[in-house]
Each structure stands twice: as C-alpha cells, then as structure tokens.
From Swiss-Prot:
This is Protein zwilch homolog. One of its GO terms (cellular component) is RZZ complex. Keywords: Cell cycle, Cell division, Centromere, Chromosome, Kinetochore, Mitosis, Phosphoprotein. The lineage of its organism: Eukaryota, Metazoa, Chordata, Craniata, Vertebrata. One of its GO terms (biological process) is mitotic spindle assembly checkpoint signaling. Component of the RZZ complex composed of KNTC1/ROD, ZW10 and ZWILCH; in the complex interacts directly with KNTC1/ROD. Disulfide bonds: none annotated. It is found in: Chromosome, Centromere, Kinetochore. Essential component of the mitotic checkpoint, which prevents cells from prematurely exiting mitosis. Required for the assembly of the dynein-dynactin and MAD1-MAD2 complexes onto kinetochores. Its function related to the spindle assembly machinery is proposed to depend on its association in the mitotic RZZ complex. Belongs to the ZWILCH family. PANTHER family: PROTEIN ZWILCH HOMOLOG.
Length: 591
C-alpha cells in the first residue's frame, strides 16, 4: 500500500512538473489526462480563472477536474444521475461545462501533492531540490455534509525553501436566508489559527452593465462593465464601501452590440473585413444588403444627382441614404447617441462607400458600379471634390479627371475589391479621428499607429479594427463616466497603449482606476452583486473568506433554480436566492 502511494505521489509530481516546465517555455497544450477520468490544466496568469469569483486569485494555478464526457456518454449518465446531485446537468448532451470529482478523490490528489513537496519525504524518487509548483485546486462535487466545492493547496516558501503548505476548503450554499456576524467570523479565524488579532478587508462588486439576449435567435454579447471596490478594515457584513476605498472599473466589451449607438459603424467595419478577407483569400462572403434597391441603381441615382448639381454641393448636402443607416437606439442614452453621428462633411468617395457598403452583394456589382463611375469621370459629367490626403486609386482617377486625362484601369481580378476597400478605409479612419479629436480624447500623434498608411492594407484594416474596439469601449462606458472627462481620457490612453503592443482581444478586461467620490452615485444606493470579507493576520495566505453573491460563483455545480410556479405575475421572485461562500484554511509546517 505504501509503495503504491509513494509511486502515485512521484508520478503526480512528475506530470505536474512537466506541464509547468512546458508553460515556462511557452509551450501551451491541452489539459493532460492523469487518470482515465481525471484531467489537469494549468491556468496562466491573465487567463480566465474560475477561482477569481471566490478568492479574487488570478495567478498561475493547476486546476484538476473530471474529464468531460463525450456527448454519446451523457445519455447513460442521465440514467444514473440521482435527482439530488449537484453536479452539472447533462440533460442537453451539449456544451457540458466543467465537471467535479468526488470529495474523497479530491482529498487523495491534494495528499499526493502535499507528499511530493514535503522535504521530509526523502524516500520519494524525486530530484532534489524539489521544485515548488504552483497552487493545486481540485473541483469537488459537494457530496460531503459541508458542501465542499473546491479543495486547494498552496506552498509556503522561505528563502526558496519549501517550509509548509496551506490547505483550503471552499463550500457554497444557496440560501433564501443567511445569517452571519463579522465578529463571529473573526473569532472563528482567531480560534482556528491561534491568533490574538486579525485584520479584515472588504470587497464589493457592482454590475453596471451586462448584455442580455434580445430574443431566442440573438445571443447575449459578452459585454460586461463592473465596479470593484475594496477597503480595509471592514466594519460589518454588507457594509457600503467608504469613500476612502480603492475602486476599479473592469471593462470587457464585445463589438457590435445590436442596440448600441455604433451599430451602423460596426456594420461598415464588417463590410470592410469582408473585402479584406476577399482580397486575401479570393473568396468573398457578402453581407445581407440594407437597401431595397440594387447597388447599381443607387450609384446611378447618385451620379445623376451630382450631374444635376454640376458636381458641386454634394459634400454639404445632407445624405438621406447615410442617415437611414443609423440604428434606432432609443434604449441607449440619447446624449451618448448624439456624440457619434454620421459626419456631415462626407466627400464623394465617402458617400459612395456608404451606398455601396450597404448594397453590394456580388463581385459583378463592384465592376458595374465602378464602370459607371469611371465613365462619368471620363465624360466630365461630374467633377466631385475629395478630402485631401487620400492615396486611393479612385481618388487618383478623380484628380486626373480634373485635367481631362485619366489612366486606363482594368476592372478585373482584385482591383474592384481593392478600390472599394481603400475608400472604406479612408472613410472609417476619418470617422474615428473625428470622434477622438472632437471629444478631446486623443491627438493625431496618439492615433498615428492606427491610421498610418505606410503599412500594407491588411495591417491597416487590422489596426482600424482595434481602433473601433477602443471606440466601442468608450461609448459603452460613457453612460457611467461621461461627466468625468479625465476618466474617459485615461481610459482612452489605457486602451491605446494596450493595442499598440497587443493583438485584438475582445475578451481582454480593461481596468480603469477611479476615485470612489467620482462614481459614488453608481453604488451608494445600489445593492452589490457580490460582497466579500477576508479575515487574515500576518501571512495573507492564511485567511477566512465569507462571500455573498446573487449568482453562483461555482461553475461546475448546479443549484436549485425556481420554476414558473415560484414567480410572481410580474416575473420577479418573491424570495431571492443568495449564494454564500465560505473559505477556510489550515497551515501545515514541514520544518
């Protein structure tokens, strides 16, 4: 028995060490199988961490869990699963989330991790000195009386030597009523760890915005804006954060919010990406048109109107076609909507882009439209004006037409696609410049990286895509910090700095430090979605945590969800369900 246990500890440590070394070398692989039904994954710093909902931890950790079942196996599990189980529901047979291990199995794995790191276990066949591995956390199925949902182990090191380990137990319950006293929690911590004094730290999270599905056919976006506030000491349970707290806005924005004020601009960006993909791959997947008329009809009408005006006035004329592209955003704060409206100074090429991007559905449309335009220029029917600074092929032809001579352009191959892509890029760049400079959020120097014409056209499109995401972030935050210009400016600079150094990432959470006094109206009269107190003394690893939240922080467990019989006529719950988390720990000294 002991020999088998020793071998298990050696093997477990060896597998974890291999994974850790691969990560340090930048080799990222899928979770590895430790046993037939057990897998281990290494969560790097900055990656989504399931423990963040409980401990606010975001460092590198090992996560141990049950191997997800193949879809065909889920039907068999359904038959075996009892009604009382808290393990994730397999009823759909799809999108099965993280799965938990029995509490007993989790304790065994924590024991192997502890054995392997104990310097007193000299009989183990492990190369010395033992490498201190990242913390190990095991998902548990809450099958014990305490409702354990996580077990964790974190090493204590002194001068690069492993001197002990902290063992964590996390429990979670769904309650309609909860009763807890801060002094009782402090006394529990003192008694458990033989302490005379303790420190308490409060934390509250207020959900300012979270997108919801419009209907059954449109899924909710991943946009979420939350205000996190921490302070010390915490004086009572559910204390309102004092103005001396530290506050941070956590912002994650997915572009293309259907109800957002930028929906029309996002549609133009999508069309730009379609053209860029077509130019790169030779295959173009056209968007559904927004116009009832064909692209050729719209362009011909546009040229006829310009001809009647003898080529003048087209830039100042209010373009009703462009106006129709504006999305109805009645649900969005009107003042925010007014900040980003279609520019009134669109030149010929920009108006042409608006018409063609909303109506072109084929390569033939492109060829026919540009044929009409070039013929009108050659005949001298129109002499449209353009903004300065454009290097597009169409702008060169227009400038040549002023002098009565034009280069011959063969509208074949990728040329029509590139021509429309160029004028779209010019138009969108000017849109973004107009907003950022108009709102005094950035200068041309700040934006130079995003609008530089010196890089190849695919890179230009990619950078414009980044710039659009920055704009989406700002517009999403404006309802909350619009009156605080310095906050909007700071957020702009944070985003610009990030995207000059990193690829586009709409899952990235941007963090904006704020003064509680500047956002007190957002939280002082509101209930937090999450409230937590941490009690510790000396080593911050040794702590007791109590948390209350209005949604389950445990992604591998299902809790009771109310059915329709429990809902009132207006759809609200008579009694709200709360989730209480408790984290306790014990310290083991090796030396």
């Amino acid at each position: 028995m002991w020999e088998r246990l020793n071998c298990a500890a050696e093997d477990f440590y060896s597998r974890l060490l291999q994974k850790f070394n691969e990560e340090k070398k930048g080799i990222r692989k899928d979770p590895f199988l430790y046993e037939a039904d057990v897998q281990v994954q290494l969560i790097s710093k900055g990656q989504p961490n399931p423990l963040k909902n409980i401990l606010n931890e975001n460092d590198i950790v090992f996560i141990v869990e049950k191997v997800p079942l193949e879809k065909e196996e889920t039907s068999h599990i359904e038959e075996l699963q009892s009604e009382e189980t808290a393990i994730s529901d397999f009823s759909t047979g799809e999108n099965v989330g993280p799965l938990a291990l029995p509490v007993g199995k989790a304790r065994q794995l924590i024991g192997l991790y502890t054995m392997a790191h104990n310097p007193n276990m000299t009989h183990l066949k492990i190369n010395l000195p033992v490498t201190a591995l990242p913390p190990l956390w095991v998902r548990c199925d809450s099958s014990d009386p305490e409702g354990t949902c996580w077990l964790g182990a974190e090493l204590i090191t002194t001068n690069n030597s492993i001197t002990g380990i902290v063992l964590y137990v996390v429990s979670c319950k769904a309650d309609k009523n909860y009763s807890v006293n801060l002094e009782n929690l402090k006394n529990l911590h003192k008694k458990r760890h033989h302490l005379s004094t303790v420190t308490s730290k409060g934390f509250a999270q207020y959900e300012l915005f979270k997108s919801s599905a419009l209907d059954d056919t449109i899924t909710a976006s991943q946009t979420a804006i939350a205000l996190d506030i921490s302070w010390s000491p915490a004086d009572e349970i559910l204390q309102i954060p004092p103005l001396s707290s530290t506050a941070t806005l956590n912002i994650k924005v997915e572009s293309g919010e259907p109800r957002g004020p930028l929906n029309h601009l996002y549609r133009e960006l999508k069309f730009l990406l379609v053209l860029a993909d077509g130019l790169r791959t030779g295959v173009t997947e056209w968007l559904e048109p927004l116009e009832a008329k064909s692209a050729v009809e719209l362009v011909q009408e546009f040229l006829n109107d310009l001809n009647k005006l003898d080529g003048f006035g087209d830039s100042t004329k209010k373009d009703t076609e462009v106006e129709t592209l504006k999305h109805d955003t009645a649900a969005v704060d009107r003042s925010v909507k007014r900040l980003f409206k279609v520019r009134s100074d669109l030149d010929f090429a920009e108006q042409l882009w608006c018409k063609m991007s909303s109506s072109v559905i084929s390569y033939q449309d492109l060829v026919k439209c540009f044929t009409l335009i070039i013929q009108s220029l050659q005949r001298g029917d129109i002499q449209p004006w353009l903004h300065s600074g454009s290097n597009s092929l169409l702008s060169k032809l227009i400038h040549q037409s002023y002098h009565g001579t034009m280069d011959t352009v063969s509208l074949s191959g990728t040329i029509p696609v590139q021509m429309l892509l160029e004028i779209g890029l010019d138009k969108l760049k000017k849109d973004y410049i107009s907003f950022f400079i108009g709102q005094e959020l950035a200068s041309l120097n700040h934006l130079e990286y995003f609008i530089a014409p010196s890089v190849d056209i695919q890179e230009q499109v990619y950078r414009v895509q980044k710039l659009h995401h920055i704009l989406e972030i700002l517009v999403s935050c404006m309802p909350f910090i619009k009156s605080q210009h310095e906050l909007l400016f700071s957020l702009t600079q944070i985003c610009i700095k990030y995207y000059k150094q990193n690829p586009l990432d709409e899952q990235h959470i941007f963090q904006l430090p704020v003064r509680p006094t500047a956002v007190k109206n957002l939280y002082q009269s509101e209930k937090p979605q999450k409230w937590r107190v941490e009690i510790y003394s000396g080593q911050k690893k040794i702590k007791t945590v109590w948390q209350l939240s209005d949604s389950s922080p445990i992604d591998h467990l299902n809790f009771h969800k109310p059915d329709f019989s429990e809902l009132t006529l207006n759809g609200s719950l008579e009694e709200r369900i709360f989730f209480t988390n408790m984290v306790t720990c014990s310290q083991v000294h090796f030396k």
